[in-house]
C-alpha cells in the first residue's frame, strides 16, 4: 500500500529532453530550477520532498509513503535494486515518481507568473525530467556542473539570478541515519569529486570527464548493440559469451566519475548517490538507454534472477521476475507496479526525442531506425578520404555505413576484467592506459578507459555479502579505436605485438587506505566478427576461434595495493605495469621496477588530483 501513487506527470506523452537543449529553453529551465528548489526546501519528513524521494534509494532506510503499520523487509538497506534483473525497471518507475513530484511543483510555480501565464502553465504541463547523454557529451553544460548561480525568468518577466540547485543539495538537517559514515555524517551538502581536504574539485572533475568521454561513448555503443539477452544487458555479472558492458556497468561508470576524487563523494556511494541532483539527470539517461535497447530487441524483457544483495523490497535470495512488486511504487493505492507494463513509457506520459521520427511505426521500422540512430550518435566514423583502412573497417562494424557490398571480417579487441564482487566493501575503479614511454602521466593520447565499481555497504549487508563470496562481477574496456588509430590491421599477431610494445597498464583507485584485490583477473580478448553484405548487425564468426592474450596484460592474481605511501606516491592510487617479459605483471610490490621508481618521483601527482 502507498500513500502516494506513481502515475507519472500530467499533460499526455511528452519528451524528456537532452540537458544540452533543455538549459537553452527559457521556460523549461526556469520552471525546473524553481521546482527543484521548491522540493529541496520542503521539510525532510515530507514524502514529496527531495530528501524523501532521494532517500528511497538508500539512507535513511525508512519506509516511503507507507501507512505507519506497514511491515517491511527487515533488512538494512534502501529500496534500490542493484546487481539483479530488476535494475532497469525499478529505476524506470523511480525516475517517474520524481518527475511526477517535480512537475507538480512546477505547475504551482507557473500559476504565479503575471505575464504570458498561459504559456508558462502549458510549459509546466510539458515539463519532463531532462537527461544527460553521457555517451555523446560527457562534459555537461556549465549549469549542471559549474555555475553557482543561474539566470532565470522572474514572475513579472524580468531576468533574475538565483542560486543553482542543480549543483548540490543542502541537508536541513544532516539526517541522524548518516552517523557512522565518515565525511557523509558531516558534509552539509552533497559533494562531487572531493579532494583530500574534503572539498569539491570541479576543474579536475571536468578534466576527468573529458578524459573518459571517448571510452564512455564506445562503451555506450557496445552496451546497446551487443547485449541480446535481458540478463547480460540488465545487470553486471559474469556471463558466458559476453564482451560488452551491461546497462548497470555503464551506469556505474558515471557514478564513479562524478563522485570519486581523492576520497569518495556522494555519487560514488549507493546509500547517498540520489541526494546529488545530477543523479536524476543520469538516471533519466539510463532509462533512455533502456528504451533504445528495447527498440533493438523488441519482445525481450525481464527474465528470472536472484536478489543477491537484499533491499527493503526483497530479502536476499529472493527469486525475482517480471511479476515481482517494485516496492515502494504503486499504480494505485493497493496495486504495486511490476515490470510487466513498463515496456511502454507512454503509461507514464513520457518519451524521448530519439523516437520522434518513428512514432507509431512497426517494431521492424523502429528497430532499423534506432539502429542507424545509435550508429550515427555513438558509432565510429570513417577516416577522412579513406586514409585509414582499419578505421574504415571498424566503422563498417561499429559505425554509420551499412551499404557495404563486401563480406567483412575483423577481430574485436576488448580488455576483460573480473573480480569477486564482494571482496571489497566499498566502491573502487580499475583504470587502463598505455605506458610505452615509461611515463605515469595519463593523457588523451594514451588513456584507454576505466571500470568503476559502485557500492554502498553497511555492517548488515556486508555480512550478507560474505555469504556470497564466490559471486563474480566483470567489466570491459574496448581497444579497437586505438588499434585502428595506430595499426592498419586487427590481425591477432600484429595486435599482440602492438599491445606489448605499448605496455598496457592498469591501476586501482579507491579511498586513501590500503587494500588487496586478490581476485582480480585481467586479459585481452579478440572476438572474430562477421558482417555479411548489407547486414547492419555483426555476429560472432564461429568458424574462427576466439583469441585470448594473457601475456600482454597478465591475469593479475597477485597484490594490487591501494595507498602508496611506502613509495612516496599519492595515497589512494595503485598502478600495475605489464613487464617486457611475456606473462609477467609488475605490481606495486616490485619496488625495484622502473614503474615504482617513477611513482616515487611523483609522476602520478597530477593523476591523483584527477582521479
UniProtKB/Swiss-Prot annotation:
Q: Give me the residues that bind Cu cation A, please.
A: 57, 82, 91
GO molecular function terms here?
Answer: metal ion binding; tyrosinase activity
**Which reaction is the catalytic activity of this chain?**
2 L-dopa + O2 = 2 L-dopaquinone + 2 H2O; L-tyrosine + O2 = L-dopaquinone + H2O
> How is the protein altered post-translationally, as described in the entry?
The C-ter is probably cleaved after Gly-379 since the mature active protein is smaller than the protein encoded by the gene.
* Keyword annotations: Copper, Melanin biosynthesis, Metal-binding, Monooxygenase, Oxidoreductase, Thioether bond
Propeptide stretches in the record: 380-611
UniProt GO BP: melanin biosynthetic process
Q: Which residues bind substrate?
A: 255
Give residue numbers for the site Cleavage.
379-380
The UniProt record lists the 2'-(S-cysteinyl)-histidine (Cys-His) crosslink at 80-82
Function text: Copper-containing oxidase that catalyzes both the o-hydroxylation of monophenols and the subsequent oxidation of the resulting o-diphenols into reactive o-quinones, which evolve spontaneously to produce intermediates, which associate in dark brown pigments. Involved in the initial step of melanin synthesis. Melanins constitute a mechanism of defense and resistance to stress such as UV radiations, free radicals, gamma rays, dehydratation and extreme temperatures, and contribute to the fungal cell-wall resistance against hydrolytic enzymes in avoiding cellular lysis.
Record note on quaternary structure: Heterotetramer.
Record's protein name: Polyphenol oxidase 4
Organism ancestry: Eukaryota, Fungi, Dikarya, Basidiomycota, Agaricomycotina
Gene that encodes the chain: PPO4
Amino acid at each position: 500500500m502507498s500513500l502516494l501513487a506513481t502515475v507519472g506527470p500530467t499533460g499526455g506523452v511528452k519528451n524528456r529532453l537532452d540537458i544540452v537543449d533543455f538549459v537553452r529553453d527559457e521556460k523549461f529551465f526556469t520552471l525546473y530550477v524553481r521546482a527543484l528548489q521548491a522540493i529541496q526546501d520542503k521539510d525532510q519528513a515530507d514524502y514529496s520532498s527531495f530528501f524523501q524521494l532521494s532517500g528511497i534509494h538508500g539512507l535513511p532506510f525508512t519506509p516511503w509513503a507507507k501507512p505507519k503499520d506497514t511491515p517491511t523487509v527487515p533488512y538494512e538497506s534502501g529500496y534500490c535494486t542493484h546487481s539483479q534483473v530488476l535494475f532497469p525497471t525499478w529505476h524506470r518507475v523511480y525516475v517517474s515518481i520524481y518527475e511526477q513530484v517535480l512537475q507538480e511543483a512546477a505547475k504551482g510555480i507557473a500559476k504565479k507568473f503575471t505575464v504570458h501565464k498561459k504559456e508558462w502553465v502549458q510549459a509546466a504541463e510539458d515539463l519532463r525530467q531532462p537527461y544527460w547523454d553521457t555517451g555523446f557529451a560527457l562534459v555537461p553544460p556549465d549549469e549542471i556542473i559549474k555555475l553557482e548561480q543561474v539566470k532565470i525568468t522572474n514572475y513579472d518577466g524580468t531576468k533574475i539570478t538565483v542560486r543553482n540547485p542543480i549543483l548540490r543539495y543542502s541537508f536541513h538537517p544532516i539526517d541522524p541515519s548518516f552517523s557512522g559514515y565518515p565525511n557523509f555524517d558531516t558534509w552539509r551538502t552533497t559533494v562531487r569529486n572531493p579532494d583530500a581536504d574534503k572539498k569539491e574539485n570541479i576543474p579536475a572533475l571536468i578534466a576527468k570527464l573529458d578524459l573518459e568521454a571517448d571510452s564512455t561513448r564506445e562503451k555506450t555503443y557496445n552496451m546497446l548493440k551487443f547485449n541480446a539477452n535481458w540478463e547480460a544487458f540488465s545487470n553486471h555479472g559474469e556471463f558466458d559469451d559476453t564482451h560488452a558492458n551491461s546497462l548497470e556497468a555503464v551506469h556505474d561508470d558515471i557514478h564513479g566519475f562524478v563522485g570519486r576524487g581523492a576520497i569518495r563523494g556522494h555519487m560514488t556511494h549507493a546509500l547517498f548517490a540520489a541526494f546529488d541532483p545530477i543523479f536524476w539527470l543520469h538516471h533519466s539517461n539510463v532509462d533512455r538507454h533502456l528504451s533504445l535497447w528495447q527498440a533493438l530487441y523488441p519482445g525481450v524483457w525481464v527474465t528470472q534472477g536472484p536478489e543477491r544483495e537484499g533491499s527493503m523490497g526483497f530479502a536476499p535470495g529472493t527469486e525475482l521476475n517480471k511479476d515481482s512488486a517494485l516496492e515502494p511504487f504503486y499504480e494505485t493505492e493497493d496495486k504495486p507496479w511490476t515490470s510487466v507494463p513498463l515496456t511502454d513509457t507512454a503509461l507514464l506520459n513520457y518519451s524521448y526525442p530519439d523516437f520522434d521520427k518513428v512514432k507509431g511505426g512497426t517494431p521492424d521500422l523502429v528497430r532499423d531506425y534506432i539502429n542507424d540512430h545509435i550508429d550515427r550518435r555513438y558509432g565510429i566514423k570513417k577516416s577522412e578520404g579513406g586514409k585509414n583502412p582499419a578505421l574504415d573497417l571498424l566503422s563498417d562494424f561499429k559505425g554509420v555505413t551499412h551499404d557495404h557490398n563486401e563480406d567483412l571480417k575483423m577481430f574485436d579487441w576488448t580488455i576483460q576484467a573480473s573480480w569477486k564482487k564482494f571482496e571489497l566493501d566499498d566502491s573502487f575503479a580499475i583504470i587502463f592506459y598505455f605506458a610505452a614511454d615509461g611515463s605515469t602521466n595519463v593523457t588523451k593520447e594514451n588513456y584507454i578507459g576505466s571500470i568503476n565499481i559502485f557500492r554502498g555497504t553497511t555492517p548488515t549487508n556486508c555480512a550478507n555479502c560474505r555469504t556470497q563470496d564466490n559471486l563474480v562481477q566483470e567489466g570491459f574496456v574496448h581497444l579497437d579505436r586505438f588499434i585502428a588509430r595506430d595499426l592498419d590491421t586487427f590481425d591477432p599477431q600484429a595486435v599482440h605485438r602492438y599491445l606489448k610494445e605499448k605496455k598496457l597498464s592498469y591501476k586501482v583507485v579507491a579511498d586513501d587506505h590500503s587494500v588487496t584485490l586478490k581476485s582480480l583477473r585481467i586479459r585481452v580478448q579478440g572476438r572474430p566478427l562477421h558482417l555479411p553484405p548489407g547486414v547492419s548487425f555483426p555476429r560472432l564468426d564461429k568458424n574462427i576461434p576466439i583469441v585470448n592474450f594473457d601475456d600482454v596484460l597478465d591475469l593479475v592474481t597477485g597484490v594490487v595495493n591501494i595507498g602508496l605511501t611506502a613509495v612516496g606516491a599519492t595515497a589512494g592510487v595503485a598502478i600495475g605495469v605489464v613487464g617486457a617479459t611475456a606473462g609477467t605483471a609488475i605490481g606495486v610490490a616490485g619496488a625495484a621496477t622502473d614503474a615504482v621508481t617513477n611513482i616515487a618521483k611523483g609522476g602520478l601527482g597530477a593523476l591523483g588530483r584527477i582521479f
